[in-house]
Every structure is written in C-alpha cells, then in structure tokens.
Curated annotation (Swiss-Prot):
Function (record text): Scaffold protein in the commander complex that is essential for endosomal recycling of transmembrane cargos; the commander complex is composed of the CCC subcomplex and the retriever subcomplex.
Assembly, per entry: Component of the commander complex consisting of the CCC subcomplex and the retriever subcomplex. Component of the CCC subcomplex.
Species of the source: Dictyostelium discoideum
Pfam name, any one: COMM_domain
Gene Ontology CC annotations of this record: nucleus
Listed InterPro entries: COMM (IPR017920), COMMD5 (IPR037357)
Coiled-coil features, chain-numbered ranges: none
Name of protein: COMM domain-containing protein 5
Length: 205
C-alpha cells in the first residue's frame, strides 16, 4: 500500500479519505440479520463505485486505489480499537513512512472524529470464511514422445474453508519455492509490524 499511495496526488488521497470516513460512519453491521447484510452490501458497492469513478477521473488503476483504501481503513480501525493516544498514532503512521500530506490528513481525522468513528466501528464485526485445512503433495507428470520421456514434478495443493468450499490447484516446483520464500517474508514483515502499537495483534474479546 505505502509505495502506491506515495504516487497519488494529494487531492486524490483526500477523496479516498472522505470515502473512508463515509464508509466507517454508515456501515453499522449485524450479519445475523439478513437485512443488515443486504444493507452492508449496498453500502460497500456504493463506496466501491464512487472510488472507481474517482480513480478514473484521476487516471489511477481502481485496483490500486482499493488497496490504499483498504490499508488506510485497517490502520484507522485498529488504532480506534486499541484506543492509542494521538501522539502514538502520529508516531506510528510516521514510522510506516506514509507521505507527509497523508499523515497530516489522517491525523486530523483521528484527532477530530475518533470518538464518533470508534462508537460505530467497534460495534461491527464481519466474519469471513477461514482456512480450515491446507494439504499438498508432489505429483509427477510423465511427458513422452518418440525420442524422450520427461518427468515433470508438480505440487498439488488442496484448500478447504469453513464454508465447506474446496479448491484444488497445481503449482510448479519453481513457484512452490517462491511461495515458500514469500510466506517466510510475510511472516517476518508481520512480526516487524507487531512492534508498531496500532498494528499489533488485537486481543480476542
């Protein structure tokens, strides 16, 4: 997210923050009630459409603006849940190396609207399907021709989630090693982020 938002114009960043605050103020969620889930979907689609229009107006890939929107949303949400002080909030988002104009705008939102946003965001909870099992094994595909016979090992992976959905796919040996590297790097990055108070793990309540 950070390398992306560093390339955005300040006016576009302000548009994203305005939509972010609007989203956090309007999404009172109780997924036990079907009508509340429908309302959440409508709000999400509306914000997404507005973000897409703003992205197109600023000649920005909507996928990139969605990444920045989501990242800023979780920074604010976690800070509100942790109830960090204004000073710690500024110090932590500065450590993240966000653009200075974004730090200023984000700090202003946190200083002036944190009470209202906290009351709303702390009362909602969205539960997405979770990974229930992940299996993998090495398989060998035999490719034969008139002149040669080649053994091509691949990794077969199977993922299952708590909704009962299953997905099976193949990964080449090279991509499997890249996956191992990126998974290890991600775990290290998460460990580093946990040292920042507003991004530390939330305690289960």
């Amino acid at each position: 997210m950070i390398p992306v938002c560093q390339k955005f114009e300040q006016t576009f960043i302000k548009d994203i923050l305005s939509l972010l605050v609007l989203y956090m103020k309007t999404k009172m969620i109780n997924l036990v009630k079907k009508e509340e889930e429908d309302k959440l979907n409508q709000i999400t689609e509306s914000i997404h459409d507005k973000l897409t229009v703003s992205s197109n107006d600023n000649k920005v890939d909507p996928n990139l603006s969605s990444i920045v929107f989501t990242g800023l949303y979780y920074i604010l949400k976690v800070a509100l849940k942790k109830k960090v002080s204004n000073q710690i909030f500024v110090a932590d988002i500065t450590d993240l190396k966000l653009p200075q104009n974004l730090i200023t705008d984000l700090t202003n939102i946190y200083n002036t609207q944190s009470k209202d946003l906290a009351e709303r965001s702390n009362n909602d909870k969205i539960l997405f399907p979770q990974l229930s099992s992940f299996k993998w094994r090495v398989d060998v595909i035999i490719s034969s021709s008139f002149t040669s016979r080649v053994l091509n090992p691949v990794i077969l992976m199977e993922m299952n989630d708590t909704n009962g959905k299953s997905k099976v796919f193949e990964v080449s040996i090279d991509n499997f090693h890249k996956l191992r590297y990126n998974a290890a790097k991600l775990l290290k990055d998460l460990e580093d982020l946990e040292q920042i108070q507003i991004l530390s793990k939330l305690e289960n309540k």
